[in-house]
Regions:
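Intrinsically disordered, low-complexity regulatory regions enriched in serine/threonine/proline
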Residues: 1, 69, 73-156
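Terminal, regulation- and interaction-focused segments at domain boundaries
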Residues: 1-30
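Alpha-helical structural elements
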Residues: 9, 19, 54, 65, ...
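Long, continuous compositionally biased terminal/linker segments
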Residues: 17-20, 26, 48-97
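An amphipathic, hydrophobic-aromatic interaction surface with interspersed Lys/Arg
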Residues: 33
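Short, well-structured beta-strand/strand-turn elements
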Residues: 36-48
Length: 156
């Protein structure tokens, strides 16, 4: 099954760090805490049968809930360790940029793609369901069928 994701070797931060994925995730959590946020959940999941794996970080800032699910990119050379480090490094740098934006624009605007909708999907999962092909099914939110509608309220 093709995930549609690029190879890790073709993306920034490939084999640029010796730090463990855990250390990058700890740095990422400190960024969230620095904004006054609260980390709710974190995890790593993999599906040996499909080869898909991803990191997940769920957090709350000022009453809004967010969930980052970041795929580990496939490696041409099957270097899973380097791919995991790269994924955790990318999460950190993505979050760092969004935290800077949040200071000016607010957390919901900055982290909008990770904002949790009432049905449990994030804004990005709702708008680009194809991304679910690149992550383990355990982290993928259920997708709506054609014509289905979710009623829900946005809490301000």
């Amino acid at each position: 099954m093709s995930t549609g994701l690029p190879f890790g070797e073709d993306v920034n931060y490939w084999q640029t760090s010796k730090s463990s994925p855990d250390s990058w995730m700890e740095k990422t959590k400190r960024l969230i805490l620095g904004l006054g946020g609260k980390v709710l959940m974190e995890g790593f999941g993999s599906e040996p049968a499909s080869g898909r794996s991803a990191f997940m970080l769920a957090f709350e800032i000022k009453g809004d809930h967010f969930k980052i699910v970041w795929p580990v990119l496939p490696s041409r050379g099957r270097n899973e360790g380097a791919a995991r480090i790269q994924a955790a490094t990318l999460i950190y740098h993505d979050t760092k940029a969004k935290c800077l934006s949040a200071v000016v624009l607010g957390a919901r605007a900055a982290f909008f793609s990770y904002w949790m909708l009432p049905d449990g999907r994030t804004a990005v999962e709702a708008s680009v369901p194809e991304l679910a092909k690149g992550i383990p099914a355990i982290f993928a939110a259920p997708q709506l069928g054609k014509g289905e509608v979710i009623d829900g309220e946005v809490v301000e």
